[in-house]
Amino acid sequence: EQTFEAETVDGLPSQADLEAAMRELGRSLESLRKAPVTEPFDGPAILSGRAAAVFFHEVLGHRLEGQRQRGEQEGQTFTKDVGKPVLPDFLSVSDDPTIRRFGSTWLSGSYEYDDEGEKARRVDLISDGVLKTFLMSRLPIANFGSSNSHGRAETGHVPTGRQGNLIVSSTKSVLESELRKQLIEEAKKQSKPYGLYFEDISSGFAVTTRRSPQA
């Protein structure tokens, strides 16, 4: 399955691009049909940029939403970690709904005002690995009493703190070819027959409640 989104009709793929995507999907399905059945594997892995985006959105982003720090049913993964390191010090995370494009890519999380009328603004969530704040609507939580313009809602629902455009930045970077070499080296170091490279992830799903296996 593959979906396409665009800011305007002109941004949608051409007929030729759609046909190329269909052919690529067919090749992928054929490869899956021929692929051997695999067993659970414990070993080194690398996520591509696209796969890492889904990972950060689901695993980290949802747990930094303000309302998830409230209530006994929530896992509250990071509630008590403000001011503490939660990521390596070369990583920082922000959420910026004011930017409409990243390079040539249109960002669907952009907005001028959130659903509570607050003007959109960038929020630095994690700086140099240290947790600074949460994504806030006007619903207060302990030590955070006001909105930071991330109150968003589906039709008919009360606005809550939600992600816009989650941006992960790093002070360390290497070429993809070098990452692949490091993956092979790590697999050999761990005496594993191979490592895993995740090119894409079809979708994400996060449950943050206390009784969930994901909590």
Predicted regions and their residues:
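Internal alpha/beta scaffold segment
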Residues: 1-66, 87, 132-133
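Residue-identity detector for glutamine
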Residues: 2, 15, 67-69, 73-76, ...
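Generic signal for short, ordered secondary-structure residues
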Residues: 4, 76, 105-108
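Residue-level signal for secondary-structure boundary elements
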Residues: 30-37, 67-68, 187-192, 197
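A sequence-level detector of short, solvent-exposed, charge-rich linear segments
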Residues: 41-44, 48, 64, 70-75, ...
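Dual-mode signal for accessory low-complexity, basic/Gly-rich regions
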Residues: 81-215
